[in-house]
């Protein structure tokens, strides 16, 4: 080889080596821009609407960082795979949301560093695994009620939660005061310590969005310990050992050498409370090591709760008596009877307080035949003791009877069947029998222990179980069966129906229910003052007694009308339905004009529950329809039609009120009617004299008459007029009497002879115009004999009272003692301190001052 060729070969070899070296350098530079590691936290996640994990990625920092959940495990990014992107950084932490649609399983979380994330992007060296597990809402761990200075209930879950609802109740009332949440620990503060059984109802959501809803029992721990202070707990109660942090280890051991009790536990996740149950534990001092450092202890003692039942074999006529005692006095103990299933027997609960010696007696009400135990519970500690079995047998002499051997009622009414019970509180009543086409068996229970049950039987709807009821809400009834051939909706026929009462499965006594034919007896018209409040039966009868509701055939327009219907057999219909539903099907009340005038149809008033108040007094077979003439309208049609032209009731209209029980209904075979007529007059007041001449003495009468309803309150004013001096004003409140008159006595003893005045009478409520008259004061007539004086006093007592009556319903004859208001006379006077001369001097001085200023 020539020298030139050798040199050329060396140069070519050097060039090849340099090319390889340069390529290696270039390749190394490209590899630096890549994700090198990825870490997923947490590495397990529950499926849920808000599940997510954090992914920390180390990279070159030159490009954006991308992570994705490799659903198909192909090492590449697919467009449908969950992903997240962050800006370029050497270390980036990204939040990756896991959709609820992702199936449970193990997946790779892949990472890559590139300018963008597109389909086909390759997983680089960085990836980690993630377990997606099936949706699992937060689990309830515990709920403990204790008092560390603040009464509270700690509720612990197995993971962090958000509280949507958290209520602590005693079964009825929400006792929660406030709620605080720390991860999976929820503290509910209460206003006090509750010894009753508590429940917690919650609705919480975990971090994955899964919701848990439930109601759980609360454990009551009356003793709270957190240090080595002298803490005492009675055997059988719970002790709350409270740590300074959640999920803290707790070691328990007996202090005595002969007590080898040891236990290792913890407060549990998201709880600071370790509950130590002393039930069955040796009486000893127990020491707690909390978190390896915190020390606490409690002395477990015997409460010595004892329960004694006086007699373990009694009858249904006897109460359960006994006594309870303990080693500590002034304690509250709850006593209750338990049936053979261990359930509390209703109405047997009682609470006793132990005296200073720790003793108390109890007496529970009688119970049905069966086997029972008595449970005593110390209210504060929850220590419970149960008695031996108490056997209760049915008293042999228990009987049922009827208060009356014959019960009379009308078809359609409600029969009151009074059942008396002796030696038992239950009995079965049979009404009728198969031969009568109707038979019903109803069991009654005397829950108020008065020895009787009043069974109500609605003969208007005998086929329905709702046709039975009891008069006292404390008593109970059960319809066992009804056997009948009566078509639906029809009443029982008139006749005699056998009654039978049985206790213990055997018939004790019998009686007879006599259903008589019903009748439509009468209609009467009454009137009351404008605005009278008549809504209940008592209101009507009180108004009649006080003469504020009077029977009439003439009433003033604007006053209240009361139509009284007397008819038997309607009580059951009114109990089962209402006036509007019954009108047109069972009966009609028509108030029709009798004087419409020539070429005009009669007015028919629209009487219904909207325009009238219906008051049913079924016990007395009386029904009141109350309406105000100002509130009802009328149509000139055969029956009231609110779609036709409507008219008002006018003065001088006359009406006939007719109540008809319809033959097409269930209460009568033929139409039965009763009616009453009344006239509407102008509301007027009239004074008895055009000019009243009174004496200058007391007890001078002012009187008049009125067409408005008796009981209407009037105001009478006596006002001085003309040149009368001094001026005066006298007023009195009076009420229209049953005969349409009114009067009041006034005192004119301070007035002068020939003083003149004006009298005005006006209604306090209504449309009647005022009545006026003149008056003059004359010389008083002297009383010459004692007899005359006595007569005057009696007359005064019947016409006046010392004070006005605030409520007109108290008495229709009450009047108010007139009140006199003196009117001051008008007199002339000069301005104090100034005369004419002084005023002139002041004017001159002012003028001079003005001139001086001008100069």
From Swiss-Prot:
A cellular-component GO term for this protein: plasma membrane
Database matches in InterPro entries: DUF7827, GEVED, PGF_CTERM, Surf_glycop_sig_pep
Key words, A-Z: Cell membrane, Cell wall, Glycoprotein, Membrane, S-layer, Secreted, Signal, Transmembrane, Transmembrane helix
High-level lineage: Archaea, Methanobacteriati, Methanobacteriota, Stenosarchaea group, Halobacteria
One Pfam family matching this protein: DUF7827
Glycan attachment positions: 78, 83, 108, 167, 174, 187, 203, 227, 230, 313, 363, 441, 548, 588, 608, 620, 642, 656, 754
Signal peptide: 1-22
Residue stretches of biased makeup (Low complexity): 782-802
Modification note: Glycosylated. Cleaved by the archaeosortase ArtA at the C-terminus, with removal of a short hydrophobic segment.
Function as written in the Swiss-Prot or TrEMBL entry: S-layer protein. The S-layer is a paracrystalline mono-layered assembly of proteins which coats the surface of the cell.
Motif (PGF sorting signal): 832-834
Locations listed in the record: Secreted, Cell wall, S-layer; Cell membrane
Annotated transmembrane regions: 831-851
Coiled coil feature spans: none
Membership in a protein family: Belongs to the halobacterial S-layer protein family.
Record's compositionally biased regions (Acidic residues): 817-827
Name this protein carries in UniProt: Cell surface glycoprotein
Region listing for Disordered, in residue ranges: 782-831
């Amino acid at each position: 080889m020539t020298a030139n060729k050798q040199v050329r070969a060396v140069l070519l070899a050097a060039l090849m080596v340099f090319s390889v070296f340069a390529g290696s350098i270039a390749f190394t530079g490209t590899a630096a821009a890549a994700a090198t590691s990825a870490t997923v936290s947490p590495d397990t996640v529950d499926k849920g609407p808000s599940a997510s994990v954090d992914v920390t990625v180390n990279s070159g920092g030159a490009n954006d960082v991308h992570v994705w959940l490799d659903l198909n495990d192909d090492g590449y990014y697919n467009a449908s795979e969950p992903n997240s992107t962050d800006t370029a950084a050497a270390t980036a932490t990204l939040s990756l949301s896991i959709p609820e649609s992702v199936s449970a399983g193990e997946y790779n979380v892949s990472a890559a560093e590139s300018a963008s994330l597109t389909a086909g992007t390759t997983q680089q060296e960085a990836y980690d695994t993630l377990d997606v597990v099936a949706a699992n809402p937060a689990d309830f761990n515990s709920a403990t009620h204790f008092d560390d200075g603040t009464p509270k209930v700690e509720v612990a879950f197995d993971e962090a939660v958000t509280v949507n609802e958290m209520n602590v109740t005693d079964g009825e009332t929400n006792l929660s005061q406030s709620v605080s949440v720390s991860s999976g620990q929820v503290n509910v503060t209460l206003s006090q310590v509750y010894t009753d059984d508590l429940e917690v109802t919650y609705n919480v959501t975990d971090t994955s969005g899964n919701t848990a809803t439930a109601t759980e029992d609360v454990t009551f721990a009356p003793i709270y310990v957190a240090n080595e202070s002298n803490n005492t707990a009675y055997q059988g109660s719970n002790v709350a050992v409270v740590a300074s942090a959640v999920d803290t280890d707790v070691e328990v051991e007996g202090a005595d050498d002969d007590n080898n009790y040891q236990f290792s536990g913890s407060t549990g996740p998201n709880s600071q409370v370790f509950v130590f149950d002393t039930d069955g534990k040796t009486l000893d001092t127990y020491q707690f090591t909390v978190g390896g450092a915190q020390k606490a202890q409690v002395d477990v003692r015997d409460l010595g709760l004892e329960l004694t039942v006086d007699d373990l074999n009694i009858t249904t006529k006897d109460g359960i008596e006994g006594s309870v005692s303990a080693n500590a006095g002034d304690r509250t103990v709850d006593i209750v009877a338990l049936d053979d299933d261990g359930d509390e027997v209703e109405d047997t609960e009682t609470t006793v307080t132990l005296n200073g010696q720790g003793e108390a007696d109890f007496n529970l009400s009688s119970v049905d035949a069966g086997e029972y135990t008595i449970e005593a519970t110390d209210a504060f500690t929850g220590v419970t003791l149960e008695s031996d079995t108490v056997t209760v047998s049915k008293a042999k002499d228990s009987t049922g009877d009827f208060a009356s051997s014959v019960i009379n009622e009308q078809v359609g009414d409600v029969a009151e069947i009074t059942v008396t019970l002796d030696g038992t509180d239950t009995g079965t009543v049979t009404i009728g029998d198969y031969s009568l086409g109707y038979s019903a068996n109803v069991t009654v229970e005397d829950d108020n222990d008065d020895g009787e049950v009043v069974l109500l039987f609605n003969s208007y709807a005998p086929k329905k179980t709702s046709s039975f009821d009891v008069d006292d809400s404390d008593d109970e009834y059960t319809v066992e069966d009804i056997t009948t051939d009566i078509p639906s909706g029809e009443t029982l026929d008139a006749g005699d129906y056998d009654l039978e009462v049985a206790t213990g499965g055997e018939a004790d006594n019998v009686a007879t229910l006599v259903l008589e034919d019903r009748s439509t007896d009468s209609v009467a018209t009454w009137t009351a003052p404008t605005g009278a409040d008549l809504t209940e039966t008592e209101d009507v009868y009180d108004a009649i007694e006080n003469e504020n509701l009077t029977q009439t055939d003439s009433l003033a327009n604007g006053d209240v009308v009361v139509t009284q219907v007397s008819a038997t057999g309607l009580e059951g219909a009114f109990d089962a339905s209402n006036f509007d539903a019954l009108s047109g099907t069972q009966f009609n009340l028509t108030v029709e004009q009798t004087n419409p005038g020539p070429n005009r149809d009669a007015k028919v008033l629209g009487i219904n529950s909207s325009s009238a108040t219906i008051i049913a007094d079924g016990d007395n077979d009386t029904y009141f329809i109350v309406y105000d003439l100002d509130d009802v309208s009328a149509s000139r049609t055969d029956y009231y039609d609110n779609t036709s032209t409507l008219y008002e009731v006018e003065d001088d209209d006359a009406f006939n009120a007719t109540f008809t029980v319809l033959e097409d209904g269930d209460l009568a075979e033929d139409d039965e009617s009763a009616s009453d007529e009344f006239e509407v007059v102008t509301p007027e007041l009239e004074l008895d004299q055009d000019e009243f001449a009174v004496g200058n003495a007391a007890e001078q009468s002012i009187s008049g008459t009125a067409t408005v309803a008796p009981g209407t309150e009037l105001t009478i004013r006596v006002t001085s007029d003309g040149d009368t001096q001094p001026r005066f004003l006298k007023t009195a409140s009076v009420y229209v009497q049953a005969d349409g008159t009114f009067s009041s006595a006034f005192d004119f003893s301070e007035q002068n002879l020939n003083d003149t005045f004006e009298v005005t009478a006006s209604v306090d409520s209504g449309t009647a115009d005022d009545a006026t008259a003149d008056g003059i004061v004359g010389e008083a007539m002297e009383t010459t004999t004692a007899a005359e004086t006595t007569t005057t006093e009696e007359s005064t007592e019947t016409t006046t009272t010392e004070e006005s009556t605030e409520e007109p319903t108290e008495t229709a004859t009450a009047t108010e003692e007139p009140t006199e208001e003196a009117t001051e006379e008008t007199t002339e006077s000069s301005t104090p301190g100034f005369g004419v001369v002084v005023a002139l001097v002041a004017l001159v001085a002012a003028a001079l001052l003005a001139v001086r200023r001008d100069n």
